[in-house]
Every structure is written in structure tokens, then in C-alpha cells.
Amino acid sequence: MYARPDLKYPLLFALAKCSVAVLCFAMVWLDIAVFHTEILEISFTEITQELMLALCALLFWTAPGTGRKSGFEFLAAGFFACLLTRELDGLFDPISHSAWLWPFLAIAAVAIGNAVSAKHRQRTVQALGAFMRTPTFAALATGFAVLIFSRIFGMGSFWHQVMGDSYQRLAKTTAEEGVELLAYGIWLCASFEYWVKCRLAESWSPQTATS
């Protein structure tokens, strides 16, 4: 007889993804239909984007598993922390328009330096190679593709073509930021799945994953 498949966690992850999709729409809807924030720096959409990136970094940074911490976790957490710094550029604008670049570079230097250090280099390469063969990496790659689409889809010249003389910047911003929020939501779900599977100490963890 075949063993009954354990569907608890696949269903949990599917529910999480659906919930995040609904959350993304709800945040945009609150900004546009209820509070009329125009999706500026202080808005439900922007703040949710920042929280999602912070959670992604935290989930990779705190991924459990005795003796399995390697430069890979630092690298992944640093990637999301760098994106968070870029999203928080409004906090640095009073200093200068590009002040966000300095903490961005500092975080990147620490994360990359740790990952390629003599202590972690070999394990980082092995962990990264193994991680790239997991469904979680595919989900992160999908989120990255959606993020690229949001940038292209949000080009002002494109929306001028779509709306002509009726062009309104808010329409462009809503579409761009909404799709960007969805990309971060996909990343958050993937990060959550990674954390849970590491917590369960399943065989696909970065040192041993093969599928």
C-alpha cells in the first residue's frame, strides 16, 4: 500500500499565497477607495511593501536548523534588506536624495563579504546550488519576474499611450505599485515556506536539496 501523502503543509502554503494575494488587493483598495492616499510614501501599499521585505529578510536570517547556518542565509537576508533600504529612501531624503545608497552598500558589503569569506565560501556555494534546485527558488524567481514586469508596466510613456489626453498619474502608480506589492507577496510566501521547511528539517534544506 502507498503511504497517504501529507497534504497539511502544501495546503497551508496554498492558503498563505491566496491570503497574501487578497491582502495585496486590500491594501491598494484602502489607499484608493477609502483613504485616498494616492499611494505616497505613507500609504498602506508602501508600508506593506516595506513590511514584506523586512519579513523576508527576517525569515531567511532566522531560518532554523542546528549547524546549517551558512553564508547563504546572510546573502539572502542581505538581498531583501538592501531592497528594504531602497524602499525606505523617503526616510533618507532629508539628508540627501541618494543617502539611502550608503546603508544599501554597507548591507550588501557585509552580506557578500560574509558569504564569500574563507569560513563560509564553500558552504555558501553548495547551499546556493542546492537551493536553486528547490521549488522555493522557483517561487523567488517568479516574484523577481513580476517585479521586473511592474517596472516595465509602470513606465509613464506606456500609460500616456494607454490613456492619451486623459492620463492620470494615479492610474499608473496604482498599477505599478499594486503589481510590485504582489511581487513582494510572492517573495514573502516563498520565504515563509523556506523557513517552515527548515523548521521541519526536511531533506530539501540548502545542504541536501535535490528537487
Protein language model features and the residues they cover:
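Hydrophobic cores of alpha-helical transmembrane segments in multi-pass inner/ER membrane proteins
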Residues: 17-22, 49-62, 104-119, 178-194
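Membrane-proximal helix-loop-helix units in multi-pass membrane proteins
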Residues: 77-132
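C-terminal transmembrane-bundle signature of multipass membrane proteins
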Residues: 150-161, 175-205
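Alpha-helical transmembrane segments in multipass membrane proteins, preferentially the mid-helix core
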Residues: 56-61, 109-130, 141-142, 146-153
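Short aromatic-rich membrane-water interface segments that cap or initiate transmembrane helices
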Residues: 37-48, 167-181
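Membrane-interfacial loop-to-transmembrane alpha-helix junctions, especially the N-terminal start
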Residues: 9-18, 67-78, 135-140
